[in-house]
């Protein structure tokens, strides 16, 4: 695995590395024009048809306890739709579970590659990992308290899982170094912060002020995570851009500050 990503090498993805062949291809494309000057109207109709026929990505399961059934009925009588809150809680649970695995992968690469000046520390990565796991427990507890099944895959949880599929792929790819992994973590933290903000707003709007206060503590921690990851990545990119970069620190000698 390479520790840097910006070294010059045998990258042949661009046409500039083969001017003769690329000129032939360009000439052939100009000589053989498309047989039909169509647009995307037909494919748009197909997509619309699929959208009309689709049954969606699932549904929120019914309450798993009598308490949940009663609470749902009361909330609906008040004019609110509690299943929306359950759905978004399921989304948070799925994302925090994924976040835990992302930081487990980051720690594995840290152990192999070490860190750099101003880069991640073992203590910092472990702190965030433990926070993610704690947040997963918090959301699970909230779901149980509301009488919902925390093991169910809600529609928003499904969407979150699909939309973030690329993040675990980056972290687990042996070709990706620790800086590449931090880029994936930065994307995750940006999404995570926005997700908690919306969940808190929804909780307060539905009268779950106690839960909202606890969620705010989670958001405060997530804001710290975002600052830490952004700082680590920025330090790594800046260091690599130097003409004579400082050698990468060994994992056992990684700096102790968390940020």
Language-model features: where?
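Non-heme di-metal
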Residues: 2-259
């Amino acid at each position: 695995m390479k520790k840097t990503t910006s070294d010059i090498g045998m990258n042949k993805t661009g046409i500039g590395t083969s001017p003769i062949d690329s000129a032939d291809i360009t000439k052939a494309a100009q000589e053989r024009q498309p047989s039909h000057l169509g647009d995307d109207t037909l494919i748009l109709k197909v997509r619309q048809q699929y959208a009309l026929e689709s049954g969606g990505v699932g549904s929120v399961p019914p309450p798993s306890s009598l308490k949940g059934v009663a609470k749902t009925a009361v909330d609906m009588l008040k004019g609110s739709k509690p299943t929306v809150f359950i759905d978004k809680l399921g989304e948070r649970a799925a994302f925090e579970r994924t976040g835990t695995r992302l930081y487990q992968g980051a720690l594995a690469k840290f152990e192999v590659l070490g860190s750099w000046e101003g880069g991640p520390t073992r203590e910092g990565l472990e702190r965030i990992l433990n926070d993610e796991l704690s947040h997963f427990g918090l959301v699970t507890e909230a779901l149980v308290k509301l009488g919902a099944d925390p093991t169910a895959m809600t529609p928003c949880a499904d969407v979150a899982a699909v939309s973030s599929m690329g993040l675990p792929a980056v972290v687990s790819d042996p070709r990706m170094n620790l800086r590449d992994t931090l880029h994936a973590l930065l994307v995750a933290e940006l999404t995570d912060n926005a997700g908690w903000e919306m969940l808190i707003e929804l909780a307060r709007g539905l009268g779950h002020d106690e839960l909202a206060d606890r969620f705010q503590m989670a958001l405060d921690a997530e804001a710290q995570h975002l600052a830490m990851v952004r700082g680590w990545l920025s330090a790594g990119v800046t260091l690599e851009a130097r003409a004579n970069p400082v050698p990468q620190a060994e994992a056992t000698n990684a700096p102790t500050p968390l940020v």
